[in-house]
């Protein structure tokens, strides 16, 4: 049995997602892990795929989640992820509270709970400020970097860095799928609302 910790960003996924991979083989059979194709600086390889390169071509979300994709392709990743389709679905904005609607505009790209004014800070936020830990919470994505690891709650701002880098909202299901490298032709089926996000957050980038 061989094992290694791999970062999805090193293989062209627009997400810094470290996971341990195990390969089991019969005796006498040599196995090896693939060499990284991308890197942070991109000196001897391709540069990490950024959030902007992954989702910037998507129009604003709609009520039914179906959107037309215009010819505004900004990257090779977008051309590939579209899978030759001119529309996609499940591009719906998750609901957020009135307090969160006030909080989100206060957080700049790369910012987090530390940018939230005291007048909007809940007891939890005040405690986070006091401890100074878990700096991805209430985070807004940077457009020129891969996202942080998507979790099963990437539809919430209180758990992780899930705020769109430009628009004042959380990530849509489709944006989450793109950051996991699922093509636009792929759709998620679930019997519960949260189940959609659980499936994508738990997935291994294909």
Residue map of PLM features:
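Class I S-adenosyl-L-methionine
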Residues: 1-127
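C-terminal target-recognition/interaction regions appended to catalytic cores
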Residues: 75-206
